[in-house]
Swiss-Prot record:
Record's function text: May act as an export chaperone for the filament capping protein FliD.
Gene name, Swiss-Prot/TrEMBL: fliT
Organism: Geobacillus thermodenitrificans (strain NG80-2)
GO terms, biological process: bacterial-type flagellum organization
GO CC annotation: cytosol
Protein name: Flagellar protein FliT
Residues in coiled coil: 24-88
Length: 117
């Protein structure tokens, strides 16, 4: 039961690491920890070889169920990061309008269109 149990242990650590709320200030630390756990689990998954005992099959079903929870949490973190990047871009653009107000027009509402030309 060695390799399957090791995969189960690493997956459980990964589940615990992704289940906690990640403050934005500590996100980089959490991401590096999750990345290391994913790399360790990947190395162990390459060592898995059948046949599996009943206990190993039970652990495997548990691993699959946990993996779905882990994927859902990582998708949520990805969306949070995407939103933060989008907000940072919007703030940067708004700041650029304040620094250089006449460089780009904010709107074209007051434009005059000459039909003759």
């Amino acid at each position: 039961m060695g390799v399957v149990h090791d995969v189960w242990v690493v997956t459980k650590q990964l589940l615990e690491a992704t289940a906690l709320p990640w403050p934005a200030e500590e996100r980089e630390t959490w991401l590096s920890q999750v990345d290391e756990l994913l790399r360790r689990r990947e190395r162990l998954l390459h060592k898995l070889r059948p046949p599996y005992s009943e206990e190993e099959q039970r652990l495997g079903r548990e691993i699959v169920a946990w993996n779905q929870e882990i994927e859902a949490r990582l998708r949520q973190v990805r969306d949070e990061i995407r939103d933060d990047l989008r907000m940072a871009g919007a703030k940067r653009q708004a700041n650029a309008h304040y620094v250089h107000p006449y460089e780009q027009p904010l709107s074209f509402d007051g434009m005059f269109y000459d039909k003759r030309r």
